[in-house]
């Protein structure tokens, strides 16, 4: 992708400037917080920085056992984004499956303002993770992201065709990196 000819300043410390044609919106206008409970028959999900939000059965590592009161866990739908206690380290995770997850997590449901594939990359970017760190509460190893703070920060919104182009470019670059990793392992 070519560099943009002109940029404009934003009022966001985490993102000082964006291409001139882009807009910014507050996160609360792109997502709403879902907190549905009472679905004990849904599969248990885990949030993984490497895999996204997936069923616990697919996640090989040891995880904390779910509480007995499964009806207290939050419902996650495919396409939601999940803020976990590790999001300040690795970004917000995309839900590839429907199920239930810890009530300590924040579920962000899309308002369909932007392409989820675009936000998946944005939510894992270094700059966005720095923004998440500025919204942390707590002092223990796993820390909460205060969604009431986060939702008032602005995110960059290119046009939908441009979002798609950015995703295609990043998918292509990731595939090259993955091929190089595969060659190195052989």
Name each region found by the language model.
Residues 119, 163-166:
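Interdomain signal-transducing alpha-helices
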Residues 6-39, 152, 156, 160, ...:
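Non-catalytic DNA-recognition/assembly elements of restriction-modification systems
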Residues 10-11, 25-78:
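Sequence-specific dsDNA recognition surfaces
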Residues 7-9, 85-86, 99-106, 139-164:
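A short glycine-rich beta-alpha junction/loop motif
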Residues 110-115:
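Ligand-binding loop in jelly-roll beta-barrel domains
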Residues 40-62, 81-106, 117-121, 130-136, ...:
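Short, ligand-facing micro-motifs at secondary-structure edges
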Residues 170-184:
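Amphipathic alpha-helical coiled-coil segments
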């Amino acid at each position: 992708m070519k560099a943009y000819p002109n940029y404009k300043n934003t009022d966001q410390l985490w993102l000082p400037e964006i291409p001139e044609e882009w807009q910014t919106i507050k996160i609360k206008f792109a997502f709403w917080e879902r907190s549905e409970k009472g679905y004990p028959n849904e599969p248990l999900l885990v949030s993984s920085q490497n895999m996204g939000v997936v069923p616990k059965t697919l996640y090989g590592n040891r995880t904390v056992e779910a509480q007995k009161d499964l009806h207290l866990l939050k419902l996650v739908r495919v396409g939601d984004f999940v803020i976990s206690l590790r999001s300040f380290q690795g970004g917000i995770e995309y839900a590839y499956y429907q199920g239930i997850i810890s009530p300590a997590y924040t579920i962000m449901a899309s308002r369909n303002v932007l392409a989820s594939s675009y936000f998946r990359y944005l939510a894992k970017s270094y700059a966005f993770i720095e923004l998440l760190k500025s919204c942390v509460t707590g002092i223990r190893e796993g820390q909460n992201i205060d969604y009431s703070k986060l939702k008032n920060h602005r995110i960059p919104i290119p046009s939908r065709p441009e979002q798609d182009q950015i995703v295609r470019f990043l998918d292509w670059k990731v595939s090259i990196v993955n091929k190089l990793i595969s060659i190195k392992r052989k």
